[in-house]
Every structure is written in structure tokens, then in C-alpha cells.
Curated annotation (Swiss-Prot):
Disulfide bonds: none annotated. This is Leucine--tRNA ligase. It comes from the Bacteria. It is an enzyme of class 6 (ligase). Coiled coil: none annotated. A motif ('HIGH' region) lies at residues 55-65.
């Protein structure tokens, strides 16, 4: 029988679903109640720290923000209902290039621009119905925050982890600042401005992240709650290589040698040349003087290339013979020394041995410059005479052309050659890393000042802690750092009290964001950035949610900082984030001309189903791509909320795709979630108006034997929904399948409600509302109050399921006679032991075997067997 509510249009609730009215009212109520303020945990209570990566305050939320924050909010709400003391804070990553550039473009001071954007975005976030504790808010550009960033810098400085040196750095010519290696993409462009990065020699501040390379690598094993791809990215970025350093002495230069690092000492006999980085420190000492002009020209040509361009496999690499030679230590062969664009001074020793027979890049280089190619390893199935110089053999094999090592497996030979070199003094075992120290100097004004002064007598001197914060020179400045530093700030030297110049560079904004999660837990502390007690209570973060683009930036820096601060005795934890969820992108539909690569606004397309370029009439490609203004595929969250309501927007974001996958925006699916909530509204509110429903009276146990078939069916679906939704949220974060389960429950309510008693309906609505609360908090709160629930739905306990309700009505009970199986009977789960005995004794099989004999014993294993002994 179909539900009367769905069957008869006149039986509709007296009030229609009005999401904007409901959501505005409840958001104001939650704020006034302080509902989401972090509560001090009791002795028996678990803590749960739910954290989204905090945003740069651009002024406008986009759908990527919405997805991130809603995912975290569902997790926070679930754990609050499960009885945990939950910390769910929010803040602002407010320093940096975008704010300064936006201020320049608009003629607005950076601080005014930033604080206005924060206010706007806070209001937008509040419309999402997030359970954020705003009392914990942090803003990195405020003195009360960056004072402690400077404090942490001084801790690193005192530990010898912050130092200054002249270095060739990545220079962004548009933003006019230095970039860390991690901030340059694979195409050699700035991750912010998109400019091709240049090389400059500047004096810069660095942090010794390399001191923690092994620990950062080894402790990845502790991160069982992180996605494997993120862990792999960090492992590759750290790039540990176990190998050998080999010294090649220079012919005709007493006691001058070039050290190379190799992971393939087995190929040493095949070394035909050495290649040095263009800025290798020994070049000027060994070069043929007639080659100096040519070298300078070569260096000029190379200087315009990025490291990525120099080391990529895409093209034949340029080189230049230096007019000098080295001596191969293992066979005394004289080999030429070259300089090559593909060798970087920043990696290992800045010199490599050229083994063209066994390295693809060396092979291309040798072919280009007609250098000899000598094979020293062959495949076990190949004859040495069959080898041709047509490609590099890069696998393991059998040694050839290698003197005493001929015939030995190449891997074993590598160990033997290293051992020989160590014994003779020209080799040693060595571990190297791709990881480089973290360059934190930025030539900008809108950033955290570095607390260092330059005294004419004492040199570099750290500012005293009691003098922190070193304030921004002029927080309302408009313009770029180096162009506006007309008034260099002066401070007294803490050692000799002389007037000294304050460091004018500011810190990389990742310095501010590498510890912000620590400040949330102790935000009112004006004596320390945080205390050990609070860190022990709340850290590590239980669930961190953010984009995978931060895998080797923020996430690696945060791990480093935690380890450095642990060594300083400031905290006890080893890792900052126990579990990490990297949500996929939100993609919108784009219309692109495949010939011109030009994106066309949908407003300029006459027929969306058959899209054509309005200028050329050419067919357009229809694609889903990351939302962007330039691609005309962005969707304003505010417009969606205005049209459908916050709960609908949340439900769509959670339902459309698993959280780790990309989400394709489709307004028809948004409408589908609106229809679902509207349907729930009609059934719940109409039932409240026509039935005796008061969930405060739901105190008695539901006896399954007393239920009608329809009631039993509904209760079974309800309990299965509780089980599945809980599993989806707690174990897998499969929000989409959890919402599907709620839809199944809704359908079951429609099918069965007219034949169910008020108490069953009340129990169903109570648990449905609790299950709905993390996903659609406003409509759930409205249901809860109308159902006469106590307090807020969000302060009530998460429901648990009754396993008995999931069982089939009957099951087969095996009958044993004197321990042997003789048959089975159909019984009900609710049958008592007496009822089971009577049914077993009454069945034909039992009577046949007993043949009138009275049983001595009857043993029952409920749900399985009954054993009758006579």
C-alpha cells in the first residue's frame, strides 16, 4: 500500500520547506547558545581534533573551500555526537604575495584589504552551518600570532637550525621575491604568479630541514592514516640515495681531485668522462685558460634555464669540454672533464661520472659529442661480442671489460669496487638526499618580519624574546618590498646597545602555516605559543583535511617543525597529523575550442547540447575541469545557497562523489538533493501534525515479537541504516553511500508508515533525525525541535543499532539426537528455550528417533543447534 502522504496531494504539511528561513534562524541560535565552543574534556572523555587546512583570505569562498570545510564538519559533528570532546577551529593564512599584489593593483593597503576579506569570508563560512569554534580563531598577520612565529624562529636559530648564506636562488621576476624549490613547478614556473623563474645570487635565510631528512623519511611509516600517494611524494622529494663517493684526481694538478657521487659503482670501469655543474667550485682551478671565454658564454646561456629544464629528459643536453683531464682511480684511464647543463651544484657533489654505456642521459651526451662508449655490464643471456653502441644497458647483469671483476654479478661487483676504493683511499660509502634546506627569506613587506638585527660591531644578532614582536615596518603600505623600503628600521643591539639595522626580508608564509594548528589549542596564551599540557591533550590532529597540492610544501614543513620543536623540549609528539584526507577537486563544465584552446563562456553559446564557437561556428569540446574564472566554469556557493539552501548544497557536495575523488558539478544533482530534503520535510512534518509524536517519550524497548509485518520491516531498515551509515562515516568517510542509505530509509518510511503505530514512527523519526544531523544540520535541528526532542540534536548521542532487528524472522535450528544430526526445524529468533524444546520434541523426526523414550537431557545452543540425549 502506498503512503497516503505521497498518494494524496491534499494531505500535505501546513508549512512548506523554507530552507533559508530555517537555516538563518538556527545559525543565529547556535551562535547565541555558543553551541560549538570547545569543552574541556572530562577524565573519561576522548578528545578529537578535526581540522581543515586554513584558507588564504581572498574574500570569496569557492566550491573547493565548501567541499573541504563540509567534509571536516561532518566528521566533527559525528564525533561530538559520539561523545568526544571536539576541537574544530578556523583561521586565516593572511600574509603573503596575493594580498600585497591585490593591494597594489587596487590601491588599498594590504592590512585593510586582508581584514575586509576575512570579515567577508567569515560571514560566508557561517552560511555553511559549520560547527566551528570561532573563539579559537587565528590570523597569521596579527601581532598576537606572528609574535609567536618569530619566537619559533628564535628557537630554531638557537638550535643552529636557522642560518644565513649567499646562494643562487629562484627569483620570481613578477612578484620580485625568492621562491623555495618546492614553489617552482615542473615547468620552471612560480606556483603563484606563473612567471618563468630566474636565478639570482642573494644572501638568504635558510632552515636546516636536511638535518631531519632521515627522521622525516623513517617516520613516514608512522603515518598509517595518510594516503599512500602523499607518502610516496614525500619519500621521493626527500630522495634518499645510498651510494658511493669516488675521487678522481686531476691530471697535472697535484692533490686536486673531483669527488663524484654515484649509486652505480659497478659501472666505474665504463666511465669515459666527468661532467661538472657550471658553477662547480673547482672549475676555475682546473680549466684550460684558453677556454675561459667559452665557459662564460656557456654559463650565460645556461643561466636562463630553470633546474627543471636543465635536468629534464626531454632534449639533448649541452656541454663544454674544459680542456683538462681526470684519472679514473680503478683503471688509471685518462678521461676528459666537461661542464654540462644537466648537472646541478645543489645535488650531491655537483659532479657526475659519465658512463654512456649504462645511463640513458650519458648515452645521449656521448653521442652528441662523439665520446667513446665502453660496455662493462651485459645481460646474463647476451654475449659480450653482441653488444653494440646503439643504446644504454641500464639493468643489472654480468661484469665485462672490468679486469678482476669480470664474470661477477654487477650488484655484487658494486659492493666489491666500493670496498676496494675505501681500502685504497679513493672511495667511501655515502648517503645523499634530494631534499634541500628550506629557504625562508622573502623580499616582501606583507609577511612575518625576521627577528634579526645587523649590528656594525656584533654582526647578526637575534632580537630578545621580550622585545617580540618585531612589528611590520608599515602594515598599511602599498607597494612591493624592495621598492618601498625607504626607511630601514633601526633597533638597539641586544649585545652592545648600538643602533643596528633590522632585517628587511620577511619569512615565507609557509613558516606561519607550519605551526598554526598548535596555536588553536592555546590561543589565549600570552606567555608562550602553546604549552606541553595542551599539546599532549589535543595533538596530533586526529583528522586533517586539505588538498594534495600541499603534499611536499605545508605537510612536509609542518612535520619538520614538529620534530625541531620536540628536540627543543617544547612538545612531545613525533608527528602533527594522525590522519589525512586529501579531497578531490570540484570541477565545472567547460566549452573549449580544440583548435584555438580558447574557452567560451556558456552565456555566449546558443545551444548547450550542441555547442559551437559563436565566432567561428566550430564545434566545441565539452570537458569537466577545475573551476576557474578564466574557464567560465565557476559556481558561486552563495548563489546555490540562495536558491536551494545550505543543507542542499552540503548534501550535494557529500553525495556526488567519494571525498578523495574529483567532483563534477551538475545542477540537476543539486536539485535531486533538494527534492530529497523536501520529501523528508513533507513526511516528517505531516506526521507530526497528524500523529501523537513526542521523541522524549521514546524510552521503552521495542519488542520485535509484538510488531506487525510492516513495523518489523521498517525497524529492520532503520537499524540497517544506522549500521551502514555508521560504518560509512567512521571507517571509510564514504559520505555518498551513507546518504544513499538515508534515501533507502526514506523510501521505507513512505512504504510502511501508514501501517505503523505512533511509537514506531516516533522511534524511526528520532533516529533518522540523528543520522541526518551531521549532513544537513539545519533541517535536522528543525525536525528535532518539532519532534519535541530535548536540547539540540547536535548535543544528543549518535544512535546504535539492534543486531536482533537485522535478523530474519526465522532460522533453521539443527536437531541432533545423541550428538548426531538428524534434521532441522524452522524457529523464530524470539522463541524462548522452552518454546524451542517444545517445537523440537514435537517434530516428526525427533519423535521417530525417540520412539516414545523420555529424553535425559536437552542441550540448546541458541541460534544453532538443539541436542536431545536419551
Amino acid at each position: 500500500m502506498a503512503s497516503k502522504i505521497s498518494q494524496t496531494p491534499e494531505k500535505q504539511p501546513s508549512t512548506a520547506y523554507d530552507p533559508l528561513s530555517i537555516e538563518t534562524r538556527w545559525q543565529q541560535s547556535w551562535k547565541e547558545q555558543g553551541l560549538y565552543k570547545t569543552k574541556e574534556p572530562t577524565k573519561s572523555q576522548k578528545t578529537f581534533y578535526a581540522l581543515s587546512m586554513f584558507p588564504y583570505p581572498s574574500g570569496t569562498l569557492h566550491m573547493g573551500h565548501v567541499r573541504n570545510y563540509v567534509i571536516t564538519d561532518v566528521i566533527a559533528r559525528l564525533h561530538r555526537m559520539k561523545g568526544d570532546s571536539v576541537l574544530h577551529p578556523m583561521g586565516w593564512d593572511a600574509f603573503g604575495l596575493p594580498a600585497e599584489n591585490a593591494a597594489i593593483e587596487r590601491g588599498i593597503p594590504a592590512d585593510i584589504w586582508t581584514y575586509k576579506n576575512i570579515e567577508d569570508m567569515r560571514n560566508q563560512l557561517n552560511r555553511l552551518g559549520l560547527s566551528i569554534d570561532w573563539d579559537k580563531e587565528v590570523t597569521t598577520c596579527k601581532e598576537e600570532y606572528y609574535k609567536w612565529t618569530q619566537y619559533i624562529f628564535l628557537e630554531l636559530y638557537e638550535a643552529g637550525l636557522a642560518y644565513q648564506k649567499s646562494a643562487t636562488v629562484n627569483w620570481d621576476p613578477i612578484d620580485k621575491t625568492v621562491l623555495a624549490n618546492e614553489q617552482v613547478d615542473a615547468n620552471g614556473r612560480s606556483w603563484r604568479s606563473g612567471a618563468l623563474v630566474e636565478k639570482k645570487k642573494l644572501k638568504q635565510w635558510f632552515l636546516k630541514i636536511t638535518d631531519f631528512a632521515d627522521e622525516l623519511l623513517e617516520d613516514i611509516e608512522l603515518l598509517s592514516g595518510w594516503p599512500q600517494n602523499v607518502k610516496t611524494m614525500q619519500q621521493n622529494w626527500i630522495g634518499r640515495s645510498n651510494g658511493t663517493e669516488i675521487d678522481f684526481y686531476i691530471k697535472g694538478k697535484n692533490n686536486i681531485f673531483i669527488t663524484v657521487f654515484t649509486t652505480r659503482p659497478d659501472t666505474l670501469h665504463g666511465t669515459e668522462y666527468l661532467v661538472l655543474a657550471p658553477d662547480h667550485e673547482l672549475i676555475n682551478s682546473i680549466i684550460d685558460k684558453n677556454k675561459i671565454t667559452e665557459l662564460e658564454q656557456f654559463r650565460t646561456e645556461i643561466s636562463i634555464l630553470t633546474d627543471q629544464e636543465r635536468t629534464s629528459d626531454g632534449n639533448n643536453k649541452r656541454g663544454m669540454f674544459l680542456g683538462c683531464h681526470a684519472i679514473n682511480p680503478i683503471n688509471k684511464k685518462i678521461i676528459p672533464i666537461w661542464v654540462g647543463e644537466y648537472v646541478l651544484s645543489s645535488y650531491a657533489t655537483g659532479a657526475v661520472m659519465g658512463v654512456p654505456a649504462h645511463d640513458k642521459r650519458d648515452y645521449k651526451f656521448a653521442k652528441k659529442y662523439s665520446l667513446p662508449i665502453q660496455y662493462v655490464i651485459k645481460s646474463p643471456s647476451q654475449e659480450a661480442s653482441d653488444l653494440e653502441a646503439s643504446s644504454a644497458y641500464v639493468k643489472e647483469g654480468i661484469m665485462i671489460n672490468s679486469g678482476e671483476f669480470n664474470g661477477i654479478n654487477s650488484k655484487e661487483a658494486g659492493f666489491m669496487i666500493t670496498k676496494l676504493g675505501v681500502k685504497q683511499g679513493w672511495a667511501k660509502n655515502k648517503v645523499t638526499y634530494k631534499l634541500r634546506d628550506w629557504l625562508i627569506s622573502r623580499q616582501r613587506m606583507w609577511g612575518c618580519p625576521i627577528p634579526i638585527i645587523y649590528c656594525p660591531d656584533c654582526g647578526s644578532v637575534p632580537v630578545k624574546r621580550e622585545e617580540l614582536p618585531v612589528k611590520l615596518t608599515n602594515p598599511s603600505v602599498i607597494g612591493k618590498s624592495q621598492e618601498n623600503k625607504n626607511n630601514i628600521p633601526i633597533m638597539k643591539c641586544s649585545k652592545c646597545n648600538k643602533d643596528s639595522i633590522l632585517e628587511t626580508d620577511t619569512m615565507d608564509t609557509f613558516m606561519c602555516s607550519s605551526w598554526y594548528f598548535l596555536r588553536y589549542i592555546d590561543v589565549e596564551n600570552n606567555k608562550l605559543p602553546f604549552t606541553k599540557t595542551e599539546v599532549d591533550k589535543w595533538l596530533p590532529v586526529d583528522q586533517y583535511v586539505g588538498g594534495i597540492e600541499h603534499a611536499i610544501l605545508h605537510l612536509l614543513y609542518s612535520r619538520f617543525l614538529i620534530k625541531a620543536l620536540r628536540n627543543r623540549g617544547l612538545l612531545n609528539i613525533k608527528e602533527p597529523f594522525s590522519n589525512l584526507l586529501t579531497q578531490g577537486m570540484v570541477q565545472g563544465v567547460t566549452f573549449k575550442n580544440p583548435k584555438t584552446s580558447k574557452y567560451i563562456s556558456p552565456d555566449h553559446i546558443n545551444d548547450i547540447n550542441t555547442p559551437l564557437d559563436p565566432e567561428t561556428g566550430e564545434p566545441l569540446d565539452v570537458l569537466y575541469e577545475k573551476m576557474s574564472k578564466s574557464k567560465y566554469n565557476g559556481v558561486d556557493p552563495a548563489s546555490v545557497i540562495d536558491k536551494y539552501g545550505t543543507d542542499t548544497a552540503r548534501m550535494f557536495i557529500l553525495f556526488k562523489a567519494p571525498p578523495e575523488k574529483d567532483l563534477e558539478w551538475d545542477e540537476s544533482d543539486v536539485e535531486g538533493q533538494y527534492r530529497f530534503l523536501n520529501r523528508l520535510w513533507r513526511i516528517v512534518i505531516y506526521s507530526i501534525e497528524t500523529k501523537d509524536i513526542n521523541i522524549s517519550n521514546c524510552t521503552q524497548e521495542i519488542l520485535l515479537n509484538d510488531l506487525s509485518d510492516k513495523e518489523r520491516k521498517l525497524i529492520k531498515v532503520l537499524n540497517n541504516t544506522i549500521k551502514e551509515v555508521t560504518n560509512d562515516l567512521v571507517n571509510d568517510f564514504q559520505f555518498n553511500t551513507a546518504i544513499s542509505e538515508l534515501m533507502i530509509l526514506c523510501n521505507s518510511i513512505y512504504e510502511n508508515i501508514d501501517d505503523c503505530g505512533d511509537y514506531i514512527v516516533t522511534e524511526t523519526f528520532k533516529k533518522l533525525t540523528l543520522l541526518l544531523a551531521p549532513f544537513a544540520p539545519h533541517i535536522a535541528e528543525e525536525f528535532w525541535i518539532k519532534l519535541k526532542g530535548k536540547g539540540s540534536v547536535h548535543e544528543n548521542s549518535w544512535p546504535t543499532y539492534d543486531p536482533k532487528a537485522l535478523l530474519e524472522d526465522s532460522y533453521k535450528l539443527i536437531i541432533q539426537i545423541n550428538g548426531k544430526v538428524r534434521g532441522n526445524i524452522s524457529v523464530n529468533h524470539e522463541d524462548s528455550e522452552l518454546e524451542l524444546k517444545n517445537k523440537a520434541l514435537a517434530c516428526e523426526t525427533t519423535q521417530k528417533w525417540l520412539n516414545g523414550i523420555e529424553p535425559k537431557r536437552i542441550i540448546i545452543v541458541k541460534g544453532k543447534i538443539i541436542n536431545i540425549v536419551f
